[in-house]
């Protein structure tokens, strides 16, 4: 009985820790592998397993939806007051990740327009800049994204010409491919403009000002940091070893694996925005820094003072 309860608790924690975008990705993979399995199964089994294999991705989505009922009820109570705009009521019915994605897209478009207009970057506070792009993979990832977007157009055009005879369908696919490539390039330009303006996180006299463009922001008072440790393993392994739930942590990194973990004091809660979604009072913050020793030294000086 205890083993069964422990298994159920573990699966429930996994559903809670997995965000909606990850769950949709898992459901898509299950669907693809299910369709591939149908080609390999004997003809006698295909009619029996076709519908169950199609239902598996839906079961993942339903399970995630059921786990989110308490959070959904809390959001609906918050917007139940009189005078709440209808747009806010409608937004409360959607998972927070979906609304955050819409906000992120708007921020990327604004960054792209600012880059086109050559607008000045917003001012950052005075202090020591902790960079994260000089030694990391940020430039490499952006270059790969630009290359992928450019190479996608001729490849999609060739595939559509070979396999699709209907001119109207080919034209629709060409437009979709062009829109996809243009969106990728717009996001790359907007993100680069905002990250370049941020320059890095800023360590002021009493706080750590986090900023990775529109993808992460927040202010952590140095007094709220209980400890700063170098991270030499995956965050999931670190959380398991220290008994910290993954959903009680937040990762602030452009694209690299975190190399620093900040342990925060529960009596001094902070709010950190990641991908336009707020995480309130996280227990730990995983960071990537080009020179993590600078942050560690500042935290130690703050604790000694």
Please place each PLM-identified region on the residue numbering.
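Membrane-anchoring hydrophobic segments
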Residues: 1-76
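N-terminal membrane-targeting/pre-transmembrane regions
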Residues: 2-18, 67-171, 281
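Lipid-exposed faces of alpha-helical membrane segments in multi-pass integral membrane proteins
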Residues: 30, 56-63, 143, 147-153, ...
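Transmembrane alpha-helices and immediately adjacent membrane-cytoplasm interface residues
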Residues: 59-71, 179-196
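Polybasic (Lys/Arg-rich)
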Residues: 281-305
């Amino acid at each position: 009985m205890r083993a069964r309860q422990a298994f159920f608790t573990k699966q429930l924690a996994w559903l809670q820790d997995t965000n909606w975008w990850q769950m949709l990705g898992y459901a898509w993979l299950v669907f693809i592998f299910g369709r591939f399995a149908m080609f390999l199964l004997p003809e006698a089994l295909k009619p029996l397993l076709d519908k169950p294999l199609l239902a598996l991705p839906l079961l993942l989505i339903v399970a995630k939806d059921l786990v989110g009922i308490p959070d959904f009820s809390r959001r609906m109570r918050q917007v139940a007051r009189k005078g709440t705009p209808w747009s806010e009521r409608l937004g409360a019915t959607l998972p927070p990740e979906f609304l955050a994605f819409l906000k992120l897209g708007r921020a990327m478009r604004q960054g792209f327009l600012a880059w086109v207009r050559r607008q000045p970057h917003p001012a950052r506070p005075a202090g020591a800049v902790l960079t994260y792009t000089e030694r990391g993979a940020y430039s490499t990832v952006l270059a790969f994204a630009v290359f992928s977007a450019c190479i996608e157009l001729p490849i999609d055009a060739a595939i559509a010409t070979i396999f699709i005879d209907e001119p109207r369908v080919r034209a629709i696919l060409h437009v979709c491919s062009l829109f996809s490539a243009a969106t990728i390039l717009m996001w790359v330009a907007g993100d680069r403009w905002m990250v370049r303006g941020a320059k890095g996180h800023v360590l002021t006299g009493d706080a750590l000002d986090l900023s990775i463009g529109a993808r992460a922001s927040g202010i952590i008072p140095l007094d709220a940091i209980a400890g700063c440790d170098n991270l030499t393993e995956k965050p999931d392994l670190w959380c398991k070893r220290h008994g910290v739930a993954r959903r009680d942590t937040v990762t602030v990194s452009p694209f690299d694996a975190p190399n620093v973990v900040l342990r925060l004091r529960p009596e001094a809660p902070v709010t950190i925005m990641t991908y336009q979604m707020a995480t309130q009072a996280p227990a730990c913050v995983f960071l990537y820094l080009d020179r993590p020793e600078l942050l560690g030294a500042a935290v130690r000086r703050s604790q000694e003072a």
